[in-house]
Amino acid sequence: MATRLQYDNNNCEIGVFSKLTNAYCLVSATSASANFFTGYESKLKGVIPIVTTSIGGSGTIGSLCVGNKNGLLLSHTITDQELQHLRDSLPDEVVVQRIEEPICALGNAIACNDYVALVHPKLEKDTEEIISDVLGVEVYRQTIANNELVGSYCSLSNNGGMVHSNTNVEEMVELANLVQVPLVAGTVNRGSQVISAGLTVNDWTAFCGSDTTAVELSVVNNIFKLVQSQPDFVGSEMRKSLIDTYV
């Protein structure tokens, strides 16, 4: 089930300061709030590693990276020390790579699950190839509701996806055919259309900004097929996700 969280000083844009996948979770090292880290820890401890980090000294790590169970791509602003910290902290099977892309806010420009990535139409060709190789995904250049920042206006798991609330039916059908999961047009944080800023999700759990309403939370739980997390369920889903990649 989805859990409400907030960053420092009642900031509900939790996705800007964290990144959640089926193999790991990254949390901003600059947060002064212990509750932000422990919120993730309460659902993920003992299941996947939770790593605190910054990228180029910035706490807005969710905006500056993109990843899935196969890999993690980081903005060119990341320092050598930060890069080595992540390589040392994440599972050996996760490929961690810095990418020399002019659009440094990778999390805003790319939305992905473990199989497909939707990307900003103006990404460099080399970047597209690196995304495909490192994340192990099919890559599609797209817009969502006429917005090029597809990573901001879409969140995906292997079970479903949520997109900008102004996405029309024809576009929803096209996007669903590309990503091969059910989609819903929705909001988080009491009407925010910047989906990924207020939502982090993987195949068995999700975290939403603290302003997310009960109705919005219900939509998240339904589209991403989240159930009441129990140890056996979480463990089996995590193992299945990792085995798919590493065997």
Swiss-Prot record:
GO terms for molecular function: ribosomal large subunit binding; translation initiation factor activity. The keyword Protein biosynthesis applies. Keywords: Cytoplasm, Initiation factor, Nucleus, Protein biosynthesis, Ribosome biogenesis. NCBIfam families: eIF-6. Belongs to the eIF-6 family. Binds to the 60S ribosomal subunit and prevents its association with the 40S ribosomal subunit to form the 80S initiation complex in the cytoplasm. May also be involved in ribosome biogenesis. This is Eukaryotic translation initiation factor 6-1.
